[in-house]
């Protein structure tokens, strides 16, 4: 009864405003009630750490009860500690370990990443840099010079093209000291000129081809060697070991007439195949043989044709039209075409053929009806060179035909002439490059003019008109010009000529010795058409040259093969040399002002600054 009366009249543990003193009985009762009340409030979430949730609205009674709880806690604080401090300790939450864990994980990740970077830096070697701007390699005594054009291919996987050269080496025999000829293929490092491997072949060769060939693994380069009689073999470019050799029984009644051509995969094994053109003992009978690129086995029998024509062997070349039709171009002083579908059906002696051979080119097929045969006449009379030229902004290629009298560009779709240029005595195959600013491939060609001189001409690929020409002295055998494309889609052109007479200005201080009878390598850039850059010279006879690209350093290098022999039949010592183009331009290049120029002369510093910014890249349309 006293407890009920106390609760009704006053708050527990506080002075009654009416009585002015504490009631002991009521105080004891209220202590027990307060404990129950505090437990109930905490269980229901009313108070947490001595505070109410801010989002909940409390009525006055609950405020009173919270106040009672705070007072009760203060009264039971341990001795030696202030009641206020004890309350604050209860209100503080225990510190969380998550921030420490996150910091530890972050630091551990950083440490592991740094360790991995350091390990990779020491274990993974950096690509080797080409520090050899020049080198010279003596091949020894050879007879007949170089047997086939130089081929550049990365043989040792260092990212720099290496040089494959075929020549007839004179080996010293043990009897009477007589030298015997031996056809040799040598792979030289493009980095320093060292010999990577060397093998002997059973016969002379027409070509060594390494581009566009693969046995499924891009990391394993391969090369196709075509002989002058019956030898056709696929070699590993890394070691020189033979992968397969065509059985000569397939050429029993003929010999190889030209380098082999690479086809799309026609037998369905995933590897590109090969077609060869063979010539019988009695021309004009020729025949084609399809060869598996994977095994070297013949894909069926020989396909024979009777052709009419006299002159230089043309092709075989593979031409794919805009519709996807595949034709083989070939000829003897002329250009003819035959559908690969026809060769395949006759070789396999069946009417079915792969889906890729179903396409036809209507405009080409119209020309078939003229002679009522499988042969399609493209061009007749005096053909020396045939090249396929990628047409800009299309998937079609045009045909560039070179004769003794000029150039003819045929449209690849309908074989109609696009333009014709008359120029006499063209002595070398035109080289492709970008001279004009219309992004159309232009052509540099060389023509003999008599009196120990030659004319070098650049022809605009769109109009067929000459856009640059110069007459220079040249007494020796004609060599093909070369071109290298730059990053801004221009091309520099390289060609050999004898000493030009205009005044020379060196790009590098200091004199360069000159001797009479030197052959000079000149560079022409379309930005400076009135200036030739004389890069280097040679006293021996230059018999072959090529250019390679260093993709890593955006640089290029020129390869020259010279011989001491004064005639083709006389043996002489062969030498291969390398010249870095950027290094040559900046250190020993000399400016040659053309005589007929009317434009103001350019300062040496301006040319030097421009050349220093040049970056060379691989030619995208090079076959």
From Swiss-Prot:
The keyword Repressor does not apply. The chain crosses the membrane at residues 104-124. It is found in: Membrane; Golgi outpost; Cytoplasm, Cytoskeleton, Microtubule organizing center. Pfam families: Beta-prop_FAM234A_B. This is Protein FAM234B. The keyword Membrane applies. Keywords: Cytoplasm, Cytoskeleton, Golgi apparatus, Membrane, Transmembrane, Transmembrane helix. Signal peptide: none annotated. It comes from Gallus gallus (Chicken). Its main location: membrane. Residues 1-82 are annotated as: Disordered. Belongs to the FAM234 family. It is a single-pass membrane protein.
